[in-house]
Amino acid sequence: MAEPIKLFQYNTLGALMAGLYDGSMPVGELLQYGDLGLGTLDSIDGELIVLDGKAYQAKGSGEVPEVVEVSPDMTVPYAAVVPHQAEVIFRQRFEMNDKELEKRIESYYDGENLFRSIKIHGDFARMHVRMIPKSTTERKFAEVAVNQPEYCKEDITGTIVGIWTPEIFHGVSLAGYHLHFVSDDLTFGGHVMDFVIKEGVVELGAVDQLDQRFPVQDRKYLFAKFNMDEMKEDMEKSE
């Protein structure tokens, strides 16, 4: 019997929405659980991109974004990684926008209630990303996100990594597509807002199990009070 493919998630996106930004898991430890994924860094300092077992940070405050490789001792307040194994691979041979490509991707899904890992390498006519700005305050994520910088790049080659989450797990993660991008030359990246792909290769991976871990040593998390309706509303605004 094949080894089950586990999606490893540290903390929940809902906790991040509530303003719990302190990193408590080292990136080096996180990478033991998967080679593809996403998240953010301590104090929500930019976007975390995990590709081929390496972790990158995309952040921006000026006219151009910055992408750097993340050291193993940096910490995350929230992240999700998976040992990506492509179950479906197809070539996208003509131009599509993100919504059109998502419909094609979903035609390969077996049902609607399993997580999926996603990896798309290609040439993009347009890539629109944002980066959450660093915050050490107790301001909620949606408030911080109002000032997040956005960047758009045309004619760029790179990789989208992401997780598709079923609706029944909304709150644990973001229902639907959560995608991050990094260019081949490591000069551009971030949380994907929208894109137009010219051509590329799409890989879809199965997920058999969810390994959900919690920051059990973090007193802020242990005693936090969550307003679920407000949290879901903030997730929809921010993501």
Language-model features and meaning:
Residues 1-16, 217-239:
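N-terminal charge/polar-biased segments
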Residues 183-226:
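A hydrophobic, small-residue-rich beta->alpha segment in the mid-to-C-terminal subdomain
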Residues 99-163, 168-172:
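Long, positively charged binding patches that form subdomain-scale interaction surfaces
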Residues 12-81:
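N-terminal low-complexity or amphipathic/hydrophobic leaders
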Residues 174-182:
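Histidine-centered divalent-metal-coordination microenvironment in nucleic-acid enzymes
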Residues 58-59, 128-129, 171, 189-191:
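Short helix/loop capping segments that flank catalytic or ligand/cofactor-binding pockets
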Residues 52-125:
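N-terminal, charged amphipathic alpha-helical interaction modules
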Residues 80-93, 208-233:
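Compact, glycine/acidic-enriched structural inserts
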